[in-house]
Amino acid sequence: MKIAIAGASGRMGRMLIEAVLNDSDAQLVGALDRADSPFLGQDAGAFLGKETGVKLTDDLDAVFAQADYLIDFTRPEGTIAHVAAALRHEVKLVIGTTGFTAEQKAELQAAAARIGIVFAANMSVGVNVTLKLLEFAAKHFSHGYDIEIIEAHHRHKVDAPSGTALMMGEAVAGALGRSLEDCAVYGRQGVTGERDPSTIGFAAVRGGDIVGDHTVLFAGIGERIEITHKSSSRVSYAQGALRAVRFLSARGAGLFDMQDVLGLR
């Protein structure tokens, strides 16, 4: 599997490079970074003390010409540029970027008519199994329980709520036959009045080096149920991304997510 990594100098990019180098079925053939990165020209394995022969570059076409797959955990504007290059070179994409607009998501959908794309806000196996648990719970706590989603991430995260929190909200709303767009409440301040029982609330915490904590609270009278997932390392995301690459190796064009990759549908 000839794999290139986008955002190669970042926290997630470095974890992905390490995972690819440790996978006997994978070959690192490219490492992309932003044009103003101070790491351009450095070996992609330098932070591991390894010589890979792959240099960090901002030359999209040079990287895509070598790769069969790109793993991308960057930012929406960067990912959209990578999608255009992937279409030119017929490279399959594994996308873990969050914070897309509706228009950008439509671009991903259109690209998937020509290339295979796995797009998921969270590629951890644990999170995706948790989504199934939430669907089950929501169906049984549909009346008399208020639903709140609380997430916490490191101080550097730029979007809120997290993509994973939104995935959880969509799983719950879908199980209840609702549209998350219609029932979500993002943060509260001032005199808000009594809680509307048909809503799903979101709260975001940012601080320190928290990798990612997510709790969905079903609060009833006399009891409450909390379903929580906590990430202690990004390694689970990297391993999930490699599972997604293997999944795409046997697929043609189409837009998939980790529920497809893990056979959870």
UniProtKB/Swiss-Prot annotation:
Ligand binding (NADP(+)): R34
CDD domains reported for this sequence: DHDPR_N (cd02274)
Pathway listed: Amino-acid biosynthesis; L-lysine biosynthesis via DAP pathway; (S)-tetrahydrodipicolinate from L-aspartate: step 4/4
Gene Ontology terms: cellular component: cytosol
Sequence similarity: Belongs to the DapB family.
Record-linked PANTHER family: 4-HYDROXY-TETRAHYDRODIPICOLINATE REDUCTASE 1, CHLOROPLASTIC-RELATED, DIHYDRODIPICOLINATE REDUCTASE
Protein name as it appears in the record: 4-hydroxy-tetrahydrodipicolinate reductase
